[in-house]
Amino acid sequence: WKIIPKRRYLGNSVLSLLTKIASGYWHVADSQTGYTAVSLHVLQTINLDQIYTNYGMPNDLLVRLNVYGFRVRDVVIRPIYNIGEKSGINIAKVVFTMSFLLLRLFLWRIKERYVIRDFHPLVFFYAFALFLFIIDIPLSIRVLYVFCTTGSVPPINFLTTLFVSTMGVLFLLFAMWFDMEESK
């Protein structure tokens, strides 16, 4: 991390975290740096024509490997920076494109792996977390509005919002934990 430019390090760290969530491979430290070696069995199983062809290709491949139950190993390499290379990446475009791609891949993986191929209760945990976060948005806005207009919040409103927020976070963390255990 000392040799990588700070902006790249931050972007790569966020992208790696989102890729861990989307792919289910929590042990892969850096999904964007390195190389990919796969067996003939992988090549025969995964439809390579469906894999994203641009910057998100390693992320898409990791998700597909997880859906089909393949093991992945993280091989650490030493990246080389500041030798005159010029990145052609448009950060604003990549952030939007990759975020949408990873969300789509995450939802596809959850559906394929935990609903269609073999059911797992973590689907309910993710669904409850989403439901509670949707409920929490208007509750939080209301609590903030009441506080800004009156200077105080009725305790029941505050406690309800706190409860819904806490439960949403807990459901999300348990879903991620189950996913992590299932993908080892």
Task: Cite the ranges covered by each PLM segment.
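Acceptor/aglycone-binding surface of glycosyltransferases and processive sugar-polymer synthases
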Residues: 1-55, 81-96
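Hydrophobic helical membrane-anchoring modules
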Residues: 50-184
